[in-house]
Amino acid sequence: VRTGDSLPEWHVEATPTFVISTALATRDFQDVHHDRDLAIQRGSKDIFINILTTTGLVQRYVTDWAGPEALVRQVNIRLGAPCYAYDTLKFFGQVIEKDDQDLTIEVVGRTDHGDHVTGIVKIEVPA
């Protein structure tokens, strides 16, 4: 692994079942994550995934690439455009720093509406 290496692209289909089940699994009962009618009444296009799901997807993207021995040390993300039901969330990543056993990965998750999440993940990998 070298600085500048790209991670393989990963796509997540945000089906309504995915949006609702991940919100409930993270105990996020806000109606905008499971009730389409109320989400639309509140000005949203549809239900959308929550921040805990987004954070988990970012971590999974990096650790699936790095392998089971990778240890996540830091996650710093910024949310952008919502990821609505029926969107495809496409993840891209690049190694931006390597130091002994530590890697810093820049991650972007994008839908047709723009960047849903941008961030940095720092991991420790065995030598």
Predicted regions and their residues:
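HotDog/MaoC-like acyl-thioester-processing domains
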Residues: 1-7, 83-127
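Hot-dog-fold acyl-thioester-processing enzymes
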Residues: 1-71
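Hydrophobic residues in beta-strands and at strand termini
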Residues: 14, 79, 123-125
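Short, charged/polar low-complexity linear motifs in solvent-exposed/disordered segments
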Residues: 26-27, 38-39, 74, 91, ...
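Mid-chain, well-packed structural core segment of small domains
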Residues: 62-91
